[in-house]
């Protein structure tokens, strides 16, 4: 669809379109900005763009690792069109996929999908019972992880037993393409669907096909070794961990096959009739995620405005409605949007949570809620001088410096303003900063200067906004540089979180509700 085509569509005789086709026309027109003509479906993610070269390097390193692990040459390339390709045709539509890593031996075909994510979501995929943890993926003798859910049924933990229902609940998460563990399995299942249909059409079904997911090992710590060109050498770490973890998902994607087939048929049906459903928003939109649907700006045009229902805090738990038996059923924000509830002022009947009611009152009735007692308590906790601290970090998929893990937040800069007395903080004279001058490891220099700049000998506090980030970085620096642990721990102990003051309190919410009841 182009702007030129849309202009031509305006000249089509009136009445030629039925209602559904008019919705299509309106939908396509919405794909362009009315004033600038810009394509609203083009969404770029700056972080993903910056990581492109690193993602390519991850695939290259994964191919090297797999070739060595299986002792076999592999087909892999930085150029997508040089990768192994499978394709088939269905009702005039071409389906194809390029495979990240592929090789074929005498007995089987092995296909590897590489994702530049970490294994943490699969490491944490466990059943916890009586304080014991039972991983659902375990490493076999070939250093490959396999799903062992069914094997856990009947396992005793204390006085309890792992039941089939417990395992099934976890198993279902693997088939939710919007869950942390399911989204990558879904990608691999789509590949299997294309590969298997391609082989059927080519009458090439003589070998078994194995399907593997390859991700970065969240437990891997870089040794700090580099080659003669200064590139990191990702050999086994001191605990014997490799940079990658490999998951054999052959059985799981086999279960997925007919689900993918149903989805494919549904897509083909939609393409055939070009239907537009006006009540289609949901989890599938992946709004505000890196994988957000490119049509969000079009489909959600009526919602993306000032005072949007999407502005409610804790949206996952914000909405519910009363049932005939007097109970309340939870509603998602998308269910309300699909019912044409677009703004905060339309939603009062669905709110029961204190913080959401407060937000409604602030927006609709312009009320102001201030917890003066909480502010007084906070002010008593503040000690001068105040060191206003802000860190900047880079979470590279591939660890760059010794001791770092994949995606670890690597500090390269901090900004510090020192307020010696109330209101006494000169923008220049009381400002201190550190910025790494190159791409080498400058964490030690940053640590030493930070300790020098935050002088707590005479007391004071270190003010941050959302302390979890700064405190975690300080703990990491203390682990990297044990000789400065005492000083870094001291800074950590003096952290004051401004977010805890501004985020309200349960006592405040209770007071709001009591006030409303009196009114």
Task: Set out the residue ranges of the language-model regions.
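Cys/His-rich finger/ribbon microdomains and the adjacent scaffold used
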Residues: 5-25, 30, 35, 44, ...
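Two-metal-ion RNase H-like nuclease active-site motif
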Residues: 79-86, 385-395, 497
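Active-site-proximal helix-loop-helix substrate-binding element of RNase H-like nuclease domains
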Residues: 120-166, 211-215, 220-258, 498-519
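A short acidic (Asp/Glu
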Residues: 123, 222-226, 397-402, 471-480
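Intrinsically disordered, low-complexity acidic Ser/Thr-rich regulatory segments
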Residues: 26-57, 155-188, 248, 252-260
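Conserved DEDDh/DEDDy metal-dependent 3′-5′ exonuclease domain
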Residues: 78-83, 100, 111-116, 172-175, ...
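Metal-dependent nuclease catalytic cores that hydrolyze phosphodiester bonds in DNA/RNA
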Residues: 1-111, 117-155, 315-368
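Conserved RNase H-like, two-metal-ion catalytic cores of nucleic-acid enzymes
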Residues: 59, 63-70, 111-113, 118, ...
